[in-house]
Amino acid sequence: MVKPLPRLRLQGFNNLTKALSFNIYDVCYARTEEERQRYIDYIDERYDADRLTQILTDVAEIIGANILNIARQDYDPQGASVTILISEEPVIDKKQAGKELISDAVVTHMDKSHITVHTYPETHPQEGIATFRADIDVATCGVISPLKALNYLIESLESDIVIMDYRVRGFTRDVKGKKHFIDHKINSIQNFLSKSIKSRYEMFDVNVYQENIFHTKMHLKDFDLDQYLFEEKARNLSFKERMKIEALLKLEIEELFHGRNLAE
């Protein structure tokens, strides 16, 4: 839960922009080209625009935002995107309420408060590795905090590797004219993760406190080969095959975690 600083009396609207970005990876091994294509088809169906819309709608509810508009699209041959425009204020029908009653905060800050997701399934052409990446951005303006949705998003997707960035930009001014560049306490994104998630993941931080930039990346601690095999069981493979596949998967996980090629 976000720990707020003592409540401030603000001059006008809270102009702080808080942005949380996720890169979530699912890694899989599919032995044949046909199996790899079936994995892509499976992921494409499991995380189509309808499912992603439901996940992001849940996120909006969790952080206490009001949905203004939803745009979604499935792509050919694969992938999907969803964008939800949100506001801190309740949605008001201009036709019923009259333009003069529409909150300036809603109109002014519509372009800054949004939730988006894009998916990227892909496969290695020879080595049997298949990956699924979901990029999620939650940007809010005002007192709404995207950090409230951290645990839900990690649990909602098949998260072998998670890379998260959180930053706070802008300022809000109190009634005495003093500027405040952040309105809650934080020294790590890990502060807002559940004990269950912390127990399952190895985590690494790079934070720039004076710039209000927080970066955490993590991967699952335990490696269970069966969890990474698509349409196959480890017990049906020879010892040599298991060792080869395990080495390929662990290398892929390390490279995605560190963001660079390690085998060259």
Swiss-Prot record:
It catalyses: S-adenosyl-L-methionine + H(+) = S-adenosyl 3-(methylsulfanyl)propylamine + CO2. It comes from Xylella fastidiosa (strain Temecula1 / ATCC 700964). The lineage of its organism: Bacteria, Pseudomonadati, Pseudomonadota, Gammaproteobacteria, Lysobacterales. The modification Pyruvic acid (Ser) is found at S113. Its EC number is 4.1.1.50. Pfam families: AdoMet_dc (PF02675). GO terms for cellular component: cytosol. This is S-adenosylmethionine decarboxylase proenzyme. Catalyzes the decarboxylation of S-adenosylmethionine to S-adenosylmethioninamine (dcAdoMet), the propylamine donor required for the synthesis of the polyamines spermine and spermidine from the diamine putrescine. Binds 1 pyruvoyl group covalently per subunit.
